[in-house]
């Protein structure tokens, strides 16, 4: 019979795995926070579009691992006031960047989609970002 003070292997594994998931969740929240802060043009800004591509790849891989989609990213950006969704369907999104440089957002979303292995065409037309999923 096991006493109250002893921990079984299953309990230790569950505690360690839960701590691991909490750390992953916190890291994702921090990366999305800095993404939104960057896209808003706050005091933390990435001046180079190559940095936006790198950030897009990292967040894309993170979203893919967690089963999140492009729709989730655009929803988060709209929630923070960085973009305004003009129209959307299952394979088409039209957004208007509000507090974001459209070219930086284009490079970020392109890298995000590449990291998620989604074939797409991302273009900027008349200050709107058009995303077409192939």
Swiss-Prot record:
Entry annotated with the keyword Transmembrane helix: yes
Gene Ontology CC, one term: membrane
Compartment(s): Membrane
Bilayer topology: Single-pass membrane protein
Transmembrane segments: 13-35
Keywords: Membrane, Transmembrane, Transmembrane helix
Protein name in UniProt: Uncharacterized protein AF_1560
Organism for this UniProt entry: Archaeoglobus fulgidus (strain ATCC 49558 / DSM 4304 / JCM 9628 / NBRC 100126 / VC-16)
């Amino acid at each position: 019979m096991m006493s109250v003070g002893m921990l079984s292997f299953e309990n230790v594994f569950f505690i360690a795995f839960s701590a691991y998931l909490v750390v992953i969740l916190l890291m994702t929240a921090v990366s999305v926070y800095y993404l939104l802060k960057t896209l808003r043009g706050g005091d933390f800004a990435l001046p180079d579009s190559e940095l936006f591509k790198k950030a897009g790849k990292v967040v894309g891989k993170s979203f893919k691992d967690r089963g999140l989609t492009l729709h989730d990213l655009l929803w988060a950006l709209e929630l923070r006031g960085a973009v305004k969704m003009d129209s959307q369907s299952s394979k088409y999104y039209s957004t208007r960047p509000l507090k974001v440089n459209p070219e930086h957002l284009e490079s970020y979303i392109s890298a995000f989609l590449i990291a998620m292995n989604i074939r797409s065409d991302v273009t900027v037309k008349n200050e709107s970002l058009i995303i077409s999923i192939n």
